[in-house]
Amino acid sequence: TCTIGVINMLGLAKKNNAKILQASTSEVYGDPEIHPQKEDYNGNVNTLGYRSCYDEGKRCAETLFMDYKREHNLNIRIVRIFNTYGPNMTKNDGRVVSNFILQALKGEDITVYGDGSQTRSFQFIDDLVEGLLKMMNSDSVGPINLGNPIELSMKDLATMVIRLTNSSSNIIYKELPKDDPKRRRPDINLAKSILDWSPIIDLETGLKKTINYFTTH
């Protein structure tokens, strides 16, 4: 997807003189040593680690996009998407929000990896879609971060999900996977200044909408 698939899509865009967007990821920053992460930060990625195939694949895709712009003047856009959640997300995709909600609704123990102090930043899907539309309608190539700059620990997220689902679940802790980022938070000043974009849906409101979806589908 990140190499052959990207090359195929870039070739198609070139053939049809089409604008094309690379939905990149905050994973290109790896386990960052700088907080929050700005777009000019080159990241801290273990190229041989368990997670590196995805990280490096997305970095490769960004490189290919920039190469096609330089060589063929292709009309590209690159955004780096931070953790996103909301209705219609796949329930068993392994992401932390869906995992926590499903475990809480079933009354199962909520599994937190590490001591729960590691952080992420969560944006609601509606905010992301608005950011993507603004990016496609802008003149900016990017990369531009799209994410919520409010940081939350995994323990606090689990506690919030338990409260919002009125669950009897307990929180249990397991070993943190190797190379799992300790902190993740976007600097969105470029998105604010270039796209006039910032997320507007707070986490509790978004989680309520997502929990309602999970309970009715």
Locate each region found by the language model.
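Short, hinge-like loop/turn segments at secondary-structure boundaries
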Residues: K38-D40, R95-V96, L190
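N-terminal Rossmann-like NAD(P)+-binding domain of SDR-like oxidoreductases, especially those catalyzing
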Residues: T1-T84, G114, D126, L132, ...
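Short, solvent-exposed loop/turn segments at secondary-structure boundaries
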Residues: N88-D93
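C-terminal substrate-binding subdomain of Rossmann-fold SDR/epimerase-dehydratase oxidoreductases
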Residues: N83, S98, L102-H217
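Short-chain dehydrogenase/reductase
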Residues: Y50-R59, G94-R95, S121-F122, E151
